[in-house]
Amino acid sequence: MSNSNSSKLTLIPVMIAFFTMGFVDLVGAVSNNMQEDFGLSDSAANFFPSLVFFWFLIFSVPTGMLMNKIGRKKTVLLSIIVTTLAVFLPLFDSFMPTKESQLWLMYISFSLLGIGNAIMQTSINPLVTMLVKGHLASTLTFGQFVKAIASFIAPLIAAWGATTTAPILGLSWRILFLLFFVVGMIATLWLGLTRIEEEPIEGKASGFVDCLKMLGSPIILLSFIGIMCHVGIDVGTNAVAPKILLERLGTDGDSLSKFEYATSLYFAFRTLGCFTGSIIMRKLNIRTFFTIIVLMMALAMVGFVFGTEQWELWAAIALVGYGNSNVFSIVFSQAMLSAPEKKNEVSGLMIMGLFGGTIFPLFMGFASDAAKASGALYPQVWAAVVMAVGVAYLLSYIPKVKQ
């Protein structure tokens, strides 16, 4: 077998690993189902996405150190094992004696999901660079597409499980965890049995101090905040879009599960944006494209705040999904280009910025709960306003994008 064919076959289990990376996006759909099952407030339900993304702050840089010690394949394998364990635990919540113990089991599960994803986000791209000598960008884009498939189907499976008249094994929306557990086991075994020759890693991994020192560079600091806003808007939309639809379009007796399709709509347009964006950026000025997609996101925020018709809200979800799909790659590349001699430090710092997914859902929950307490007709408007602050920051970032 030629080296080319061997490399392509080796990429298959790595792409399945990208699929397991998408498990993290089940957090939005699942937190909505949990809010109904456990009677949680908005701020309590939004704590779960925050819990997942908090671990990016803690584990991104240590993962770089770990890769130097045990290698990239073993690090990715570890991340899959942790992620698979995370989706395995909720299958046992029916054995917990109280609602409180069930809730604590979910806290542990979501923490492991965040830890596994933080390790994987940091380690899987370097692993791909060893397997692909040409067309690296297109390969990574395809990996993001595979990840987006998991993101896209997660809310659909959860909604189907919650509403089906013949619940499988009595799991309801938890059927999602069972299916993802099976995929996680396949990914673990396949990658574990796949032989990958790793090149020696020279130099030492970046430490926390090295990364934090890079914040002294204005463009890196601004990019770090930009990454936080991107992920915050991503996680926030994932969590709040069904609530906005229920609030504006729902009738008495409707539940969140009826509007879970909103999350899949978001990820469908995000997936579309990944592919078309990679093509458009080859022909269109990067700053111009960035301006267009951020303006799309701004228009989406207007729709979330003022929209009352179904088409207006669907359009808002589609616009923010498409617009936000390419923000990370552009902001990340701007930071990398600003300090090409410090790629490890910049990369670790940008991944740490993913903990923006912690901050936004918390403030969104606080805002909507406060609005409910004051008797507001549409309390989720204020959750959308929090996301709009992130979009406003990205608008201010436009002049920093190099032509």
Question: Where do the model's predicted regions map?
Answer:
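Cytoplasmic helix-loop-helix junction between adjacent transmembrane helices
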Residues: L103, Y107-F145
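Extracytoplasmic
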Residues: L9-L40, N125, T237-L245
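Central cavity-lining transmembrane alpha-helices of secondary-active solute carriers
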Residues: F47-M65, S264-T276
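Helix-loop-helix hairpin linking two adjacent transmembrane segments in secondary transporters
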Residues: G134, T139-I196
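C-terminal ends and interior cores of transmembrane alpha-helices
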Residues: I81-K99, M296-T308
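Intracellular juxtamembrane helix-capping segments at the cytosolic ends
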Residues: I119-K133, S325-P340
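Extracytoplasmic gate region of multi-pass secondary transporters
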Residues: V27-A29, G216-S264, T271
